[in-house]
């Protein structure tokens, strides 16, 4: 569950203000023009930006001023941030331990997640040997290995072609269902997501201008603000 209560954040001439409640396991698409506040929302939830007013509650705990590593959140950006000198398995394992000194059980988890995202045959390869879609699978696997209940994605598949985007989105939604994750995804591909999300939120000028329930699984109503 995500609750933002009276959150305010300002940077230069930009002001972000928001009250927002997202139930656990809801899948939400965040849309709007560039500079509308979409990435600011993710940064506030992840802890890369701190609110100047208001509170941020994540899974029942106040995380308004906690550090990113303390939050029940994983985040995936468009840039997959893979280390080119590490193998696929090692890049994935960073989600468990930065030291890469894994126990036998942790190594088994890497194998399991690799299988879930279709990378079991690529674990010993370097990122330079992978396609764009495969690199994003590695980055997604690393997020899943962190085993956090909230997953944030900022334009994660926009650099991929439409077929690969559809494939990655199908995989993502399947894994979210299996792991019972709460998902927020920033996107410009509105048509590709509209039938697959539970909710769509539009931002304009640092404020939520519209919240539309696409699948009424959470007993909410459509709201235009």
UniProtKB/Swiss-Prot annotation:
Enzyme class: translocase
Entry GO terms, CC: plasma membrane
Keywords for the protein's UniProt record, in alphabetical order: ATP-binding, Cell inner membrane, Cell membrane, Membrane, Nucleotide-binding, Translocase, Transport
InterPro entries per the UniProt record, alphabetical: AAA+_ATPase (IPR003593), ABC_SmlMolc_Importer (IPR050093), ABC_transporter-like_ATP-bd (IPR003439), ABC_transporter-like_CS (IPR017871), P-loop_NTPase (IPR027417), Thiamine_ABC_ThiQ (IPR005968)
EC id: 7.6.2.15
Enzymatic reactions: thiamine(out) + ATP + H2O = thiamine(in) + ADP + phosphate + H(+)
Topological type in the membrane: Peripheral membrane protein
Pfam families documented for this protein: ABC_tran (PF00005)
Annotated SUPFAM superfamilies: P-loop containing nucleoside triphosphate hydrolases (SSF52540)
Residue ranges occupied by any ABC transporter domain in the UniProt entry: 2-225
Residues where ATP binds: 32-39
Cellular localisation: Cell inner membrane
Molecular function terms from GO: ABC-type thiamine transporter activity; ATP binding; ATP hydrolysis activity
Coiled coil: none
Stated family: Belongs to the ABC transporter superfamily. Thiamine importer (TC 3.A.1.19.1) family.
Function: Part of the ABC transporter complex ThiBPQ involved in thiamine import. Responsible for energy coupling to the transport system.
Oligomeric form and interacting partners: The complex is composed of two ATP-binding proteins (ThiQ), two transmembrane proteins (ThiP) and a solute-binding protein (ThiB).
Protein name as annotated: Thiamine import ATP-binding protein ThiQ
The organism of origin for this protein: Pasteurella multocida (strain Pm70)
């Amino acid at each position: 569950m995500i609750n933002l209560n009276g959150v305010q954040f300002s940077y230069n001439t930009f002001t972000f203000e928001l009250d927002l409640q997202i139930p656990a396991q809801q899948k939400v698409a965040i849309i709007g023009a560039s500079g509308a506040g979409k990435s600011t929302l993710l940064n506030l939830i992840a802890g890369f930006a701190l609110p100047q007013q208001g509170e941020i509650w994540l899974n029942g705990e106040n995380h308004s001023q906690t550090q990113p590593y303390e939050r029940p959140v994983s985040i995936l950006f468009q840039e997959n941030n893979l280390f080119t000198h590490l193998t696929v398995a090692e890049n994935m394992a960073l989600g468990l331990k930065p030291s890469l000194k894994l126990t036998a059980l942790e190594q088994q988890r890497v194998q399991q997640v690799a299988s879930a995202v279709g990378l079991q045959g690529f674990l010993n390869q370097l990122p330079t040997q992978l396609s764009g879609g495969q690199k994003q699978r590695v980055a997604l696997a690393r997020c899943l290995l962190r085993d956090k209940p909230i997953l944030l994605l900022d334009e994660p598949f926009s650099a991929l072609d439409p077929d690969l985007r559809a494939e990655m989105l199908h995989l993502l939604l399947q894994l979210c269902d299996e792991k019972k994750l709460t998902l927020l995804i920033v996107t410009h591909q509105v048509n590709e997501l509209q039938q697959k999300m539970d909710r769509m939120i539009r931002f304009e000028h640092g404020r939520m201008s519209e919240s539309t329930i696409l699948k009424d699984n959470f007993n909410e109503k459509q709201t235009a603000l």
